[in-house]
């Protein structure tokens, strides 16, 4: 069927996208991994230096007539204390076959309002009432909490996915923050309203 054609077509794009994302991620965050490795190494001598692996898996997380969401899980281990692992999401507009970016979904100058919503939701998820409490837990200590292009859409809303080190230390793992369509409604543009209602209908 039509879905199959779409699934085959973007494979190459997905591969390129992943390689670029992983490259950027490594450039930005490699120093943190290195420092962690150093700290670990000081405590103990690591016997696993010689093992090395790398894996990329991708699968279709959502597909309807308007949007296709790929989830790409990447991991690599080069010895040392930590493997690098991350998940990236690629949302394709099936009319144009181009990636959907935040600017395609939100009106005007949305970043500040969206950032506030992310903080509020993360507080709710952790049962705290201040940003300081979140920071004490480790959030926003390795990077700023702000809207990023690594997100996916599903019937519940938009989920921003922060890989290890992007906003929190390695030990805390990845952080997912889901904002409901109701919460972001005032910021959504016409295209996003159409998209979200199609996705919600799929979920019923």
Language-model regions: role of each:
Residues 1-204:
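Compositionally biased intrinsically disordered regions enriched in Thr/Gly
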């Amino acid at each position: 069927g039509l879905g199959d054609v779409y699934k085959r077509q973007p494979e190459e794009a997905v591969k390129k996208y992943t390689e670029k994302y992983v490259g950027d991620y490594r450039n930005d965050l490699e120093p943190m991994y290195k420092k962690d490795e150093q700290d670990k190494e000081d405590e103990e001598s690591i016997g696993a230096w010689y093992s090395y692996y790398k894996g990329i898996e991708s699968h279709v997380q959502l597909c309807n007539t308007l949007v296709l969401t790929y989830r790409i899980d990447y991991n690599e281990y080069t010895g040392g204390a930590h493997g690098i692992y991350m998940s990236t999401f690629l949302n394709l507009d099936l009319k144009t076959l181009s990636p959907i970016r935040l600017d395609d979904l939100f009106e005007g100058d949305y970043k500040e309002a969206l950032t506030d919503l992310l903080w509020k939701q993360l507080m709710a998820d952790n049962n705290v009432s201040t940003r300081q409490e979140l920071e004490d837990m480790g959030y926003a200590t390795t990077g700023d909490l702000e809207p990023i292009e690594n997100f996916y859409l599903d019937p519940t809303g938009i989920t921003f996915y922060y890989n290890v080190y992007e906003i929190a230390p390695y030990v805390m793992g990845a952080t997912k923050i889901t904002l409901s369509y109701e919460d972001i409604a005032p910021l959504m543009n016409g295209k996003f309203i159409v998209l979200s209602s199609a996705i919600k209908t799929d979920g019923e």
